[in-house]
Amino acid sequence: MERQNQSCVVEFILLGFSNYPELQGQLFVAFLVIYLVTLIGNAIIIVIVSLDQSLHVPMYLFLLNLSVVDLSFSAVIMPEMLVVLSTEKTTISFGGCFAQMYFILLFGGAECFLLGAMAYDRFAAICHPLNYQMIMNKGVFMKLIIFSWALGFMLGTVQTSWVSSFPFCGLNEINHISCETPAVLELACADTFLFEIYAFTGTFLIILVPFLLILLSYIRVLFAILKMPSTTGRQKAFSTCAAHLTSVTLFYGTASMTYLQPKSGYSPETKKVMSLSYSLLTPLLNLLIYSLRNSEMKRALMKLWRRRVVLHTI
């Protein structure tokens, strides 16, 4: 079937923001800056956690995995989108398009469960501090990490294989910023009803269930925070929880709106904005909220910087 598809459509055209030629220059600069900050920032987090033995505990190892996911997620989408913004019309091969779709689903699926696992880790640390070592032991941590990545691989493999089996024999213009499943599915010359049922069920399980678990975890955390004797401590904890919830709500909210109904009635421009929310803004917010606001991460960064300065002076 795939050979037949490729004989009809050998490449796709990504339209991106071609309807707004006067804004493409500004969008290119803005997206490039955000992409570079996300790329460099997450790379630094990966290096810091990998080199500092004191950070080899579940909380920071979760952050390391989140940085790997966010860096990879951005790298899959952003370069192609920047090319789209810098040219009038850009093409992507049939195989290249589905390769991009696969990795978007892989890293997106992994992040969905990983954020839930991180919320559970914080819940265990704050609400059950005496039993935390037993609750979040090495075995539990490894199972959560392995399951997160396995979920991403499974989602990417099943969904990409299914969509690529559809015939594509008509228009080859994808009115989107990347080869995401809903945008590509609109070009399929076949009945996709069964796939849409699968997409709805899969999205509910992979996106909405972890999100609900995160909300429940943070509700328990907030009750624990209210019992804190220190007003300053409560304010700091509330600020951190609010920042975390803002990031996860943006990610899960826009992703569910996109994937619950692959052929939804949203306008193409609305779909592009929603895609930017979880592919461009969320990785940046995760970097700022989960890592750079963390005091231990700042300490490790300064330690690494001082070591670098000392080595240069020798």
From Swiss-Prot:
<feature type="topological domain" description="Extracellular">
    <location>
        <begin position="1"/>
        <end position="25"/>
    </location>
</feature>
<feature type="transmembrane region" description="Helical; Name=1">
    <location>
        <begin position="26"/>
        <end position="46"/>
    </location>
</feature>
<protein>
    <recommendedName>
        <fullName>Olfactory receptor 10A6</fullName>
    </recommendedName>
</protein>
<keyword id="KW-0716">Sensory transduction</keyword>
<dbReference type="InterPro" id="IPR000725">
    <property type="entry name" value="Olfact_rcpt"/>
</dbReference>
<keyword id="KW-0812">Transmembrane</keyword>
<feature type="glycosylation site" description="N-linked (GlcNAc...) asparagine">
    <location>
        <position position="5"/>
    </location>
</feature>
<keyword id="KW-0675">Receptor</keyword>
<dbReference type="Pfam" id="PF13853">
    <property type="entry name" value="7tm_4"/>
</dbReference>
<feature type="transmembrane region" description="Helical; Name=5">
    <location>
        <begin position="198"/>
        <end position="217"/>
    </location>
</feature>
<feature type="topological domain" description="Cytoplasmic">
    <location>
        <begin position="293"/>
        <end position="314"/>
    </location>
</feature>
<feature type="topological domain" description="Extracellular">
    <location>
        <begin position="259"/>
        <end position="271"/>
    </location>
</feature>
<feature type="topological domain" description="Extracellular">
    <location>
        <begin position="76"/>
        <end position="99"/>
    </location>
</feature>
<keyword id="KW-0552">Olfaction</keyword>
<dbReference type="GO" id="GO:0004984">
    <property type="term" value="F:olfactory receptor activity"/>
</dbReference>
<feature type="topological domain" description="Cytoplasmic">
    <location>
        <begin position="218"/>
        <end position="237"/>
    </location>
</feature>
<feature type="disulfide bond">
    <location>
        <begin position="97"/>
        <end position="189"/>
    </location>
</feature>
<keyword id="KW-0325">Glycoprotein</keyword>
<feature type="transmembrane region" description="Helical; Name=4">
    <location>
        <begin position="140"/>
        <end position="160"/>
    </location>
</feature>
<keyword id="KW-1015">Disulfide bond</keyword>
<feature type="transmembrane region" description="Helical; Name=3">
    <location>
        <begin position="100"/>
        <end position="120"/>
    </location>
</feature>
<feature type="topological domain" description="Extracellular">
    <location>
        <begin position="161"/>
        <end position="197"/>
    </location>
</feature>
<comment type="function">
    <text>Odorant receptor.</text>
</comment>
<comment type="similarity">
    <text>Belongs to the G-protein coupled receptor 1 family.</text>
</comment>
<keyword id="KW-0807">Transducer</keyword>
<keyword id="KW-1003">Cell membrane</keyword>
<feature type="transmembrane region" description="Helical; Name=6">
    <location>
        <begin position="238"/>
        <end position="258"/>
    </location>
</feature>
<feature type="transmembrane region" description="Helical; Name=7">
    <location>
        <begin position="272"/>
        <end position="292"/>
    </location>
</feature>
<feature type="topological domain" description="Cytoplasmic">
    <location>
        <begin position="47"/>
        <end position="54"/>
    </location>
</feature>
<dbReference type="InterPro" id="IPR017452">
    <property type="entry name" value="GPCR_Rhodpsn_7TM"/>
</dbReference>
<feature type="transmembrane region" description="Helical; Name=2">
    <location>
        <begin position="55"/>
        <end position="75"/>
    </location>
</feature>
<feature type="topological domain" description="Cytoplasmic">
    <location>
        <begin position="121"/>
        <end position="139"/>
    </location>
</feature>
<dbReference type="GO" id="GO:0050911">
    <property type="term" value="P:detection of chemical stimulus involved in sensory perception of smell"/>
</dbReference>
<dbReference type="GO" id="GO:0004930">
    <property type="term" value="F:G protein-coupled receptor activity"/>
</dbReference>
<dbReference type="GO" id="GO:0005886">
    <property type="term" value="C:plasma membrane"/>
</dbReference>
<keyword id="KW-1133">Transmembrane helix</keyword>
<dbReference type="InterPro" id="IPR000276">
    <property type="entry name" value="GPCR_Rhodpsn"/>
</dbReference>
<keyword id="KW-0472">Membrane</keyword>
<keyword id="KW-0297">G-protein coupled receptor</keyword>
